[in-house]
């Protein structure tokens, strides 16, 4: 009986690890709390905060990460190395072609939008 319980516990634990998403990173909650943007395997996704299927926002060979919501919830800023080094880009939450915001030779990562949504703080 102890052996059976041990095997059952092992299989339950093993299956829990198999379902974990180890590549999901940099979660960012929308201003209204209804959505979560995140980085997964180098692209940006959005999912409903209550769960469900995610929508892919960026698709490319580059590494996109650190999404940040604009105050109105219509735009995401994120870092990407699609131009050779990490710069800040913006994209509509509905997808589309990202717009490059910074062109520095150093690594730029967005931190937040200004309250009016016209500028982005980055480091």
Task: Please describe what each predicted stretch is.
Residues 32-35, 45-49:
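Blade/loop signatures of beta-propeller domains
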Residues 21-36, 61-79, 103-123:
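Conserved beta-propeller blade repeats
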Residues 4-13:
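Sec-dependent N-terminal signal peptides
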């Amino acid at each position: 009986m102890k052996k059976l319980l041990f095997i059952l516990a092992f299989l339950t634990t093993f299956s829990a690890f198999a379902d974990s998403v180890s590549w999901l990173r940099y979660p960012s909650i929308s201003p209204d709390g209804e959505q979560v943007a995140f980085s997964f395997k180098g692209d940006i996704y959005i999912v409903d905060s209550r769960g469900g299927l995610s929508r892919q926002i960026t698709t490319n060979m580059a590494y996109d990460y650190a999404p940040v919501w604009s105050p109105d919830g219509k735009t995401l800023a994120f870092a990407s190395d699609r131009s050779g080094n990490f710069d800040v880009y913006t994209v509509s939450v509905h997808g589309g072609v990202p717009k490059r915001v910074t062109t520095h030779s150093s690594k730029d990562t967005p931190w937040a939008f200004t309250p009016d949504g016209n500028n982005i703080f980055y480091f």
